[in-house]
Amino acid sequence: MLFQKLCISAALLCVTVAVAAQSEFPAWAYPLTPQAPKLEMEQGVIQKVPGSDVGLTISQTLDRFAVADWHPSDHPAMPLSVSNGRKPDAWACAYCHRPTGSGGLENASLAGLPADYIVQQVKDIASGVRNTALPKRIPHISKIPISQAVTDDELRAAAAYFSSLKPQQMLIVKEGDMAPKLQQRLFFFSPTDDGAQEPIGKRIIEYPEDYRRFELLHDARVKFVAHVPSGSIKKGETLVRAPGGKTELACAGCHGANLRGLGNIPSIAGRSPSYIVRQLWDIQQGARNGAMAVLMKPVVNALDSNDMLNIAAYLATLPP
């Protein structure tokens, strides 16, 4: 019932998206679920994924309090807050962010982020300091009760775990004028079944290589494809490395020369371009107001949505 209410709330936001798009709102970075999706449920059937001897049912892979771990050798032992969580509200962190910390298109990759940064972001979500430009967007709204339910010890154990992980390159970036035609999925898009193509326009098209393995089976080895417009990578590099008039841009000064973070400043290299654009837009629109977001405001206020797209396209090509 709660999920259906959230989906209805998201549907109502479609009008907001249509209006906001007129003022350069990057709607492609904020996929909405217009109605509760019909998940492909195969009750009792043992599922398999490539490279794993583990067998799980769909019901097991979708259990928020017992994370599907197809590849235990890919990561160290998980603390309980990551692998199991605590009922009723503190979901297992790895349910959404995966045992390897790779996350998905709808949320953040946590692998290798500073532990103190992770802790602060969860606390900012709990207090409302970190919000989103679409405050009823389900991936964000579902995190609020989780962030409020988790204890300090649980949070710090999870943050230490994810911080210890080495981030993996999960993106396959393709630059061009055309991209797959899309269909709405749960929280993100995927290519239509007929393989049709359409002009990419001023968008980044990002989706999991294998929707079923990613969303239903929760296989953390599934990579993501990001189609970016022709010329966007070079334009993004120019903005990030040689601002060319936008003197407020000084990414390396805070995020490090290789953009993989510096101290408690997070890495921005090799991250989901959709995620990067959402964060830039959220900060610019005043939805994110944590201490680090405030430091970013002079930077993002110098950007338009095309700048954000180009920067995100370039960052996606970098090793994490």
What function would you assign to each model-found segment?
Residues 104-110, 263-269:
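Short cysteine/histidine-rich zinc-coordinating motifs and their immediately flanking basic loops
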Residues 1-10:
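Bacterial N-terminal signal peptides that target proteins for export
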Residues 22-91, 133-250, 286-320:
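Flexible coil segments in periplasmic/lumen-exposed cytochrome c-class electron-transfer proteins
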Residues 95-102, 126-127, 163-166, 254-260, ...:
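Detector for the c-type heme attachment site
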Residues 111-140, 171-173, 269-280, 285-294:
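Extended intrinsically disordered, low-complexity coil regions enriched in Ser, Thr, Gly, Ala
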Residues 15-18:
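N-terminal signal peptide c-region/cleavage motif recognized by signal peptidases
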Residues 266, 274, 305-306:
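Copper-binding active sites and cupredoxin-like electron-transfer domains
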Residues 71-83, 95, 100, 107, ...:
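Post-signal peptide N-terminal segment of secreted/secretory-pathway proteins
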